[in-house]
């Protein structure tokens, strides 16, 4: 993740720290946050899934950086982490930004149906993992229907799946010649919804 940012970021990177992972993972980020504060940086990017993410967000707020140096992350803040962060009242996450190919507030008929049904059944917002799974079922369904239920027609199944002729929660979706998805990526910001639940909202298309 860090290598990707380093390779593609158009601005100037004024500092980089790699912290310890594993059973004895580093959870004290005071030194790194102090360096970031002193560097004059206009943003902080992190990749901290799990408990390290919560620890970093808490210390980021305690260091007085919230509202001063924007926080950007990947696989750190999402619909899986946000309920836990809200329960722990880690408000330092509010206003932070991440990118993803899907968001719960994407304005498509299929996504509205998916999100409302998921919330009704589980009482929370779906994650992008759930969105992927939902899309996958409809993709497979489209292929099965294309071969009229003849699952032995593997070539027909593959050809049908390649067309991606299904209603995606992501909106416009197709495959390239290498079978990688062609899809939008969105900048998403952590907000409170109308009921006070922490979630993310699309800001703009970034890719």
Model regions: which residues?
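Short, amphipathic alpha-helical "lid/cap" segments that border enzyme active or binding sites
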Residues: 29-33, 130-137, 141
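Solvent-exposed, acidic/polar segments of extracytosolic/periplasmic ligand-binding ectodomains
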Residues: 162-207
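Sec-exported extracytoplasmic/periplasmic mature domains
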Residues: 6-10, 34-41, 58-65, 119-123, ...
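Extracellular/periplasmic Venus flytrap/periplasmic-binding protein
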Residues: 1-63, 102-113
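Generic recognition of well-ordered alpha-helical segments
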Residues: 114-117, 139-143, 160, 186
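Short catalytic/ligand-gating loop segments at beta-alpha or beta-beta junctions
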Residues: 127-136, 157, 170-176
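Extracellular/periplasmic periplasmic-binding protein-like sensory domains
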Residues: 57-134, 145-151, 190-194, 198-207
């Amino acid at each position: 993740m860090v290598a990707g940012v380093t390779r593609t970021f158009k601005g100037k990177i004024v500092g980089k720290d790699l912290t310890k992972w594993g059973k004895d993972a580093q959870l004290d980020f005071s030194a790194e946050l102090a360096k970031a504060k002193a560097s004059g940086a206009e943003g902080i990017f992190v990749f901290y899934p799990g408990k390290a993410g919560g620890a970093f967000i808490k210390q980021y707020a305690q260091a007085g950086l919230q509202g001063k140096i924007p926080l950007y992350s990947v696989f750190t803040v999402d619909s899986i982490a946000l309920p836990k962060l809200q329960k722990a009242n880690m408000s330092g996450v509010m206003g932070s930004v991440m990118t993803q190919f899907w968001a719960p507030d994407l304005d498509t008929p299929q996504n509205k149906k998916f999100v409302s049904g998921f919330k009704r059944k589980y009482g929370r917002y779906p994650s992008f993992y759930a969105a992927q799974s939902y899309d996958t079922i409809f993709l497979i369904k489209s292929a099965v229907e294309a071969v009229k239920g003849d699952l032995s027609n593997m070539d027909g199944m593959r050809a049908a799946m390649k067309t991606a002729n299904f209603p995606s929660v992501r909106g416009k979706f197709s495959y390239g010649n290498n079978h990688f998805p062609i899809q939008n990526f969105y900048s998403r910001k952590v907000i409170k919804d109308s009921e006070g639940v922490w979630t993310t909202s699309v800001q703009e298309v970034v890719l």
